[in-house]
């Protein structure tokens, strides 16, 4: 892959929310370019719009003005070539680990049996192959987040969006997960946008770090 090819482009992005009494500006004139296969962290204080920016790039949140493009195509809705990992694993407790990983395939209307081997491969890669038939409640927080990463990768997306995925973990588990994520990225060379509060985490993981200012945020 050509790492100099621009994969994600954000231009003059603005996002506002309307309350009963006023219009709140969540993001103001954000500019960003991310190259293909690059690992980029988005760093900034609480409430500066990091998660808002990430969800907008994923097509999960409408924007007020500006443009977002992935592979030169404007983002207006969720894209099949994008995977998302949220702050909490949000696994379905009644489904097994393997069934949780395969859930996006069902949502996309694809044949689940065609992706069973890939689910097994991802679970093996993250050390969870022995837990494929377990329920989420039988796994630790760190293990559940690894399941969430497998789920985000099951349809082989080119772009992976991660919204503070390790913020709820203890320090040792978080360090282990950072090592695991870096290994996965080095093996698969996806483009990763990673939201975090931690300067240490951002520096450890990233090719580059984007820093957002306090509200009204800009970059």
Region spans (language model):
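Hydrophobic anchor residue at the start of the ABC signature
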Residues: 149
